[in-house]
Amino acid sequence: MQIGIIGTGPVGRAFGRALPALGHQVVVGTRDVAQTRSRPEWSDSGLELVPYNDLSSELFILVTGGDGALPALAAVGPALDGRVVIDATNPLDFSRGFPPSLSVCNTDSLSEQLQRAHPDARLVKMFNTVANEVMINPPAAGADSTLFVAGNDESARAAATELARELGWSDILDLGDLTAARGLEMWIPLWVRIYGQLGKPEFNLKIVR
């Protein structure tokens, strides 16, 4: 499958390593190709880098910072129409320092804002509840754990779930429509606190039935 990664931070680089190893063709969208290529983690990646507005793919994974998510999707534009867009972002607000708060919560979510801005895209919330290394290598959390998926389009959730299984996830809990993204994003302030106590980001939740 051709997969477009939207964003070039640590999460984008993690997916850029993992997905080609699974046989996927990966193209990476960035605001500035030359600047991105000059960074050591991308200079020898072997991946195609293109401006956001030239990015097209069968499936997209959005991995920008939360404040860059809406502008990034706006730049990609109509190429998103009809495509599954996995949203791995969180609406973190660092304006008052650390720990961050959420720029949106309770009655709305960043994912829902993205879906409203791009009604023809098939938004799926997934991967935002774990660190980048755990996203692509679930055993890095130290034990079997749970990944969550939410979205308004059932077939889009199924496509995202299939990709997660390719990455090694076996326990994937479907939470239904995109309003569930509110809770998934609201987990992150607690995740940040736990990270501070453990001193490492490789941990996760396990839903025991």
Per-region residue spans from a language model:
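Rossmann-like NAD(P)-binding element
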Residues: 34, 40-84, 90-97
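Active-site phosphate/pyrophosphate- and oxyanion-stabilizing loops and adjacent acidic/basic residues
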Residues: 74, 112, 162
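Active-site-lining helix/loop region of Rossmann-like oxidoreductase modules
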Residues: 145-209
